[in-house]
Amino acid sequence: MPPKEAPKKWKAPKGPKPTHRKNKNKLELGRAIKYARQKENAIEYLPDGEMRFTTDKHEANWVKLRSVTQESALDEFLSTAALADKDFTADRHSNVKIIRMDSGNDSATSQGFSMTNEQRGNLNAKQRALAKDLIVPRRPEWNEGMSKFQLDRQEKEAFLEWRRKLAHLQESNEDLLLTPFERNIEVWKQLWRVVERSDLVVQIVDARNPLLFRSVDLERYVKESDDRKANLLLVNKADLLTKKQRIAWAKYFISKNISFTFYSALRANQLLEKQKEMGEDYREQDFEEADKEGFDADEKVMEKVKILSIDQLEELFLSKAPNEPLLPPLPGQPPLINIGLVGYPNVGKSSTINSLVGAKKVSVSSTPGKTKHFQTIKLSDSVMLCDCPGLVFPNFAYNKGELVCNGVLPIDQLRDYIGPAGLVAERIPKYYIEAIYGIHIQTKSRDEGGNGDIPTAQELLVAYARARGYMTQGYGSADEPRASRYILKDYVNGKLLYVNPPPHLEDDTPYTREECEEFNKDLYVFDRLPDTRKEQVQNAAKAKGIDIVDLARDLNQLTFSAHTGGDTQKEAKSVTHGGKQAALYNAAEDLDRDFFKMNNVEGRLSTPFHKVQNSSAGKRHNKKNKSKNAKSKVFSIENN
C-alpha cells in the first residue's frame, strides 16, 4: 500500500542557530560623545543657589598652561571678554567690520633696522620715564573662607585690570614698542605660587643683556608680599663676557644697589661631567684657573666679578635667604628654605637647577618655554628649589628684531627675517663673520646703494646660503629664510657674540654705536674663534708668511674653507657649492653656449625678426599670390 504522503526531499542541515549576545563594549562612539557633552555642559550651582551653565571645553591642565605672548586683535578682544564674563548674542544684520589698526611705530624701528644715536637716545629717555608703569599682575588677597568660584572671579578681575593698564600705556605712547608679554593667567598663577612659597626669589637673566630680562616690578612685588623675603639677580651665561665687560656691569649693579652674582650653568655642568670622568684626580681650582686675568679694579668689584662655582652659589643662596623659613612646614616634615627661580624663557633656569642638583632633574631645551608648570626639587635636607615656567615680562624694546636676537621670540616661527639678520650684520664685524663661517661677503659701496663695510641683511644671507648650497627651486636663488635661521640661532647660542654695555653711570643714557663697538672689540679676535676654524686660519696665515694673525687686517689675504683670499689689488671671493644653482649666471647665454658647443660656432641673427619683410603676411592663409622674390632670413655663421 503506497504511503499517504510523499517523502520529503532530504536537505543538508544548516547547523546550529547563532546565539545573539549583547555587546559588552559600553563605550561606543555615540555614548562617548554623549558623555563628553554631558561633562562639558554640566550645570554648576553657585553658593548663593544661582545656576551657572557654560559651554567651555573641558581641557587638560597642560593645555591651560600654554604660553600666549602674542594675540591678534580679534583673539585679544575675545580673551578680554571671556575674562570679564561677557555674554554675546548673534546679530545677523550687523554691519560692523573688524579692521586692523596699524600702530604709530616707525616701520624701520619696529622691524629691526638700524637707528641713529639720536633716535636711540630719545627713545631711551622716554622708556626710563615710563619704566614705573611696567608692572606685573598681583594676586588679590584671599582667605580660606573663599569658594573656588569667588577666588577665580577675583583673580580674573585683577588680571583684567592689569591688561587694561598695559593697553592704555601702549595706546598713549605709540612711538614706544612694548615687548610681547605673557597673556595667559594660568601661567601667571604659577608665578604667584612661587612668590608666595619662596623665601628667596632668584631672578635669572642673560648676561648679554641683563636689563632687558630683569623685571624691576617683580622685585617690588616680592617685597610687597612679605618684607622679610629677599631678591637676587643671577647673571647667567657670564662665561660669554670678558672680564672687562663683567667689571663694567658689576660697577653698574653696585651703583644701583642691586644684589647680583655672576654664574655660568653651562660651565658648571661641563665641570660636573669632568668631575665624573676624572674621579679622585679632579681638582677644584680648575674652575678658577680659566678666569685669572690681570685687571686693576676695586677689591669689592673684583670680588663680585668672579664667576661662582656650584658650592659657592649654594652658599650664597643660604646667606641671602632668611635664617628661618617663612612658611610653616607640613605636619611631620622638617622646615625647608624655599628658593624660587624665575625669569624669561631660555635664560637657563632648568640648566641652573641641573647644575645645582648634580643630575638632570629638569628637562632642558633650546626652544623658549620648555618648563610648563611649577616644579619643586629638593636640593638638601634644608633647601627646596622651586622652578617657575618661563615668563615674558612686559618691557620696552627698540624693535622686534631685538627680541628675536635676544631669544625672546622663537626663531623657527619667524616670518620677517630681514630685520633680525640686519641687526646681526650691523653688530658683528664683517671680517669676524667671514672668519667664523669661512665665507666672503661681497658688499656694495654707499655710492652703489649699500652700507659700505657693513653688509646688509641680504648680502649676508646670500653669501652664507651660496657658500652652504642652500638654494630654492630654480636657478640662482639663494634660500635666505633658511640661512637666516642658522645665523640667528648661532647668534642666540653665543657663536656670534654681542654684549650690550650697561648705561652710563652718570645719567643712565645708553651707549652710542661707536661706544658699543669699543665695548665688544675684544670679542672679535683670533683667539675667540672655534678651535677647528682657528687651525684653518693659522695654517693659511703660515702659507702667507704671517706670524701674528690680525683678522681685521689679514683675513682678506687668507684662503681657507670657502674663503678664497685676494691681494691688495684683488678682492677676496667665496667658493659656492651646489652646482649650477649656487652660481650666478645668465641662463640664456648658458643655453646658447651648450647648443652651439657641438660645432664650436655661435648662431647670430643679422636682422631682427620684426624687421624682416614678409610680402605674404597680408594674404590670408598664405595660399595665393606668393611673391617669387620674397626675402629670406639670412643667418651668418661666424667662427668663434
Swiss-Prot record:
Compositionally biased tracts (Basic residues): 9-24, 618-631
Span list, region Disordered: 1-26, 607-640
Record-level Gene Ontology MF annotations: GTP binding; GTPase activity; mRNA binding
Consequence recorded when altering K349T: Dominant negative mutant; prevents the nuclear export of 60S ribosomal subunit in cytoplasm
Enzyme Commission code(s) on record: 3.6.1.-
InterPro entries to which the protein is assigned, alphabetical: G_CP_dom, GNL1-like, GTP-bd, P-loop_NTPase
Chief location bin: cytoplasm
Disulfide bonds: none
Alphabetically ordered keywords of this record: Cytoplasm, GTP-binding, Hydrolase, Nucleotide-binding, Phosphoprotein, Protein transport, Transport
Binding site residues for GTP: 236-239, 343-350, 387-390
Broad enzyme group: hydrolase
Cellular compartments per GO CC: cytoplasm; cytosol; cytosolic large ribosomal subunit; mating projection tip
Domain CP-type G: start-end pairs: 188-394
Subunit details: Associates with the 60S ribosomal subunit. Interacts with ARB1.
Record comment regarding domains: In contrast to other GTP-binding proteins, this family is characterized by a circular permutation of the GTPase motifs described by a G4-G1-G3 pattern.
Primary role: GTPase required for the nuclear export of the 60S ribosomal subunit. Acts by mediating the release of NMD3 from the 60S ribosomal subunit after export into the cytoplasm.
Name of the protein this chain belongs to: Large subunit GTPase 1
Species this chain originates from: Saccharomyces cerevisiae (strain ATCC 204508 / S288c)
Gene field: LSG1
